[in-house]
Amino acid sequence: MNAIANLAATPCADLGECLADLAVDALIDEAELSPKPALVDRRGNGAHADLHLGLMQASALSLWPCFKEMADAAQRHGRIDARLRGVLGQLGRDGEAAMLRTTEGVNTHRGAIWALGLLVAAAALEPRRTQAGEVAARAGRIALLDDPAAAIGDSHGERVRRRYGVGGAREEARLGFPRAVRHGLPQLWRSREGGAGEQNARLDALLAIMSVLDDTCVLHRAGRVGLAVMQDGARAVLAAGGSASLAGRRRLCELDRRLLALNASPGGAADLLAACLFLDRLPAVSGGWAGSL
């Protein structure tokens, strides 16, 4: 684990700070995980000419105040309603602006602000109920509410969603992050139990998400052909024994090569891996803030 704070070992006096630390840790750990197919990692920029690992790390750190304020707002408000949704929406836009100032206009974590912001708020609403499915379901209830101040979307993701008829990040959140909860996390735990090291277990979790996600980042860059390459290739790695096996490693290298040739990067899956890492750690550290509630 990249340790901004070793949260599992250190009691947390402030719930919002603890949740913000967890969220930023998850983003940095996702960025540093290597070798990820066609994504920024310790090896290089993947399919991104405008990104590098240092920028991803700086971007993640810039979002700490945003996540802290989201957690504080949810804890103060104490219930899911339109007012909370509006507050969280504005905080997310403020966080995005801070991110863009840090990155000089490069979109590094817009999707992660949405996913992790919802999960941070959901965890703060009921901090003693930290099981992944419960937290993700609460986040989904928040996401179901419309934010009246949100601009009409014309992002790459929104255009892809309309063109290809896929749900995108909004639908994934509204459903309670099923690709993270039902695919990523179970694979993470299975790989650990099977003896894989932590980095390989996380890679396998990413691949499990990639195998089932209609990733709008890949669709935007490479269409249905690219999506099939991503999903089929991820399944092939897992079927060959996962990233910890020699056969799986060879398949992973092939998937990386094919996605790079298409200039297709599974950014949506990366955001959901960060969500998995956040949810995975949450129960283990929740005892640290019990005294502050």
Curated annotation (Swiss-Prot):
Assigned EC number: 2.4.2.52
Any GO BP: prosthetic group biosynthetic process
InterPro entries assigned: CitG, TriPribosyl-deP-CoA_syn
Catalytic reactions on record: 3'-dephospho-CoA + ATP = 2'-(5''-triphospho-alpha-D-ribosyl)-3'-dephospho-CoA + adenine
Keywords from the UniProt entry: ATP-binding, Nucleotide-binding, Transferase
Any one GO molecular-function label of the UniProt entry: ATP binding
Principal EC category: transferase
Highest taxon, organism lineage: Bacteria
Cross-referenced HAMAP family: MdcB
Protein family according to the UniProt entry: Belongs to the CitG/MdcB family.
Function field: Involved in the formation of 2-(5''-phosphoribosyl)-3'-dephosphocoenzyme-A, the prosthetic group of the acyl-carrier protein of the malonate decarboxylase.
Protein name, as recorded: Probable 2-(5''-triphosphoribosyl)-3'-dephosphocoenzyme-A synthase
